[in-house]
Amino acid sequence: MAARDDAEARAAQREREVADLTTQVSFLQEELTALRRKLTESPRQARVLEERLHEVQANLAAVTGQNERLVATLKEARDQIVALKEEVDRLAQPPSGFGVFLESREDGTVEVFTGGRKLRVNVSPAVEVDSLKRGQEVMLNEALNVVEALGFEELGEIVMLKELLEDGRRALVISHADEERVVKLAESLVGQPIRAGDSLLLEPRSGYVYERIPKSEVEELVLEEVPDISYEEIGGLMRQIEQIRDAIELPYLHADLFREHKLRPPKGVLLYGPPGCGKTLIAKAVANSLAKQVAEKTGQSGKSFFLNIKGPELLNKYVGETERHIRLVFQRAREKASEGTPVIVFFDEMDSIFRTRGSGVSSDVENTIVPQLLSEIDGVEGLENVIVIGASNREDMIDPAILRPGRLDVKIKIERPDAEAAKDIFSKYLIEDLPLHPEDLAEHGGSRGGTISGMIQRVVERMYTESEENRFLEVTYANGDKEVLYFKDFNSGAMIQNIVDRSKKMAIKQFLESGQKGLRIQHLLAACVDEFSENEDLPNTTNPDDWARISGKKGERIVYIRTLVTGKQGTEAGRSIDTVANTGQYL
């Protein structure tokens, strides 16, 4: 009984276990089915998750970019706010003034000129008082204290210096209205080599002059130079050169002998004669020769000055201006001469500005210009090392008071060159190192010197032969006499130089065309013919007598001129000079 109960109990137990196992099997089967279904669906879910991941990453990148843009915008806005604040602060500041520094005081304050007032103000610690210079511009704050040092004024009025005062820090100047004013020299000008006649920059409110304008009024009219022309470069004028050396160099180099003999050196020299014959050339050579003589005498480097006055530019439409310019020229000469330097004041075309008083047609400006020059020349009497040289084609038009002894003492006529002088002039331009044609060299045995001499001899004979082809003019005098003039009567050093230049150009053209290099006698002869042909129409003034005087023909008055030229187009008929178009040239 008991055994049966026990068996039933175990059977019931097994049934329960079987039921549990069956339940578990069913659950596991369901789980297995669910897992199989999930396994089947997992690739699709993975794709969905990947898509969501990409979408989230894209959204994240967009949000990040937007965030960066917002940060940049905020930074830019902050910078703009700071800049605007600075601008507002700057605009809200009171204005700064400017003044001119005058001088410093022992207590650390300085005196400035501002707003038409002279003030004593304090200086910012950032500015060194010792570095401030008189006339310097300074910046002032609202309390009118110096806060910054600036430069010197660059704008103002132009005034002319009349003289420096004794203290060396003030000067007497002349304004544009001829008003005289005492001004102060800024620190930039103190100690600088300024002289009377210089143009200065003036700031009229403060009364300071700041700088020297490079081109002074006198320098516009005076060419200040040291010529490099020597007497050896001048041909055909040995007698005139000796005369001018005796007149100018001897008194300077042997002043003790002149004093011993109580001989007064000449004050000036007049060089007169036809155009192109070397008047200006001689005047330039004098300065160069003086410099060399000074160097030999003193053992130091010699230096001389040649003040070449541009005569017609001295004339000015305002009354008294021309006379003032002349005074400034001689004042400049005295300054140079006071340093022991020989100075030559050269007036070229002297007849254009110092004509005989009373000969003017309308203005009679010479009535005041000539006396000014006379007073300056007389003022040179007690001054050493200043020589006045005048040059003119029409010495008969210069005021006689200038030409009298005691002013322009020495008068030297520069004549037209004769045949011997022409050979000397040609030898200055035709030298042995020029390229010569082989055929011409062969004619003279290969001697370069002999070839040059032969060329010069041939061309001079061509120029100075009184042949039919060299006839130039027939002049009729007031008494009825007639005279035939040849080209040689109008020859000059300038014409000879032009002939040589023409021949050299012909030689160059021949080399370019044929390849044969070298100067030939044919080039010189052809150049001579061309020069004569071009000069055929030059004596074309409507006043033959004036033309003759300029050309160096003196004597009986000429009333009629007829040309006698055998040119490239044959012999031309004679013609009155009055019928030729007036081109304003002179032979």
From Swiss-Prot:
Any one annotated GO CC term: proteasome complex
InterPro entries in the cross-refs: AAA+_ATPase, AAA_ATPase_domain, ATPase_AAA_core, ATPase_AAA_CS, NA-bd_OB-fold, P-loop_NTPase, Prot_ATP_ID_OB_2nd, Prot_ATP_ID_OB_N
One Pfam family in the UniProt entry: Prot_ATP_ID_OB_N
A GO term, aspect molecular function: ATP binding
Pathway(s) it belongs to: Protein degradation; proteasomal Pup-dependent pathway
Organism domain of life: Bacteria
Keywords, comma-separated and alphabetical: ATP-binding, Chaperone, Coiled coil, Nucleotide-binding, Proteasome
Record: residues binding ATP: 276-281
Record GO biological process: modification-dependent protein catabolic process; proteasomal protein catabolic process
Coiled coil (residue ranges): 1-94
Location of region: Docks into pockets in the proteasome alpha-ring: 586-587
SMART domains in alphabetical order: AAA
Cited PROSITE patterns: AAA
Presence of keyword Transport: no
Keyword Nucleotide-binding included in the entry's annotation: yes
PANTHER family attached to this UniProt entry: AAA-FAMILY ATPASE, PROTEASOME-ASSOCIATED ATPASE
Recorded domain comment: Consists of three main regions, an N-terminal coiled-coil domain that binds to protein Pup and functions as a docking station, an interdomain involved in ARC hexamerization, and a C-terminal ATPase domain of the AAA type.
Protein purpose: ATPase which is responsible for recognizing, binding, unfolding and translocation of pupylated proteins into the bacterial 20S proteasome core particle. May be essential for opening the gate of the 20S proteasome via an interaction with its C-terminus, thereby allowing substrate entry and access to the site of proteolysis. Thus, the C-termini of the proteasomal ATPase may function like a 'key in a lock' to induce gate opening and therefore regulate proteolysis.
Family in the record: Belongs to the AAA ATPase family.
Subunit architecture: Homohexamer. Assembles into a hexameric ring structure that caps the 20S proteasome core. Strongly interacts with the prokaryotic ubiquitin-like protein Pup through a hydrophobic interface; the interacting region of ARC lies in its N-terminal coiled-coil domain. There is one Pup binding site per ARC hexamer ring. Upon ATP-binding, the C-terminus of ARC interacts with the alpha-rings of the proteasome core, possibly by binding to the intersubunit pockets.
Protein name: Proteasome-associated ATPase
Species this protein is from: Streptosporangium roseum (strain ATCC 12428 / DSM 43021 / JCM 3005 / KCTC 9067 / NCIMB 10171 / NRRL 2505 / NI 9100)
